[in-house]
Curated annotation (Swiss-Prot):
SUPFAM superfamilies: YozE-like (SSF140652)
Entry protein name: UPF0346 protein SPy_0467/M5005_Spy0383
InterPro entries linked: UPF0346, YozE_SAM-like, YozE_SAM-like_sf
Family in the record: Belongs to the UPF0346 family.
Superkingdom field: Bacteria
Amino acid sequence: MRKSFYSWLMTQRNPKSNEPVAILADLVFDDTTFPKHTNDFELISRYLEDQASFSFNLGQFDEIWEDYLAH
């Protein structure tokens, strides 16, 4: 069974990194309403687009999602 996207993303946290995945991980870590228990691309993508308390480049999110699927 695949880890939730949130669980995988938390393994990518690195406050000293300028990599998009590390930046997103740190932003999501501080967002208390991020959907933590899902691996549904549409749900997470819509959340980032419409509800997140931060803005993030969705093109970069798509690339991060591909990395998530590869692990």
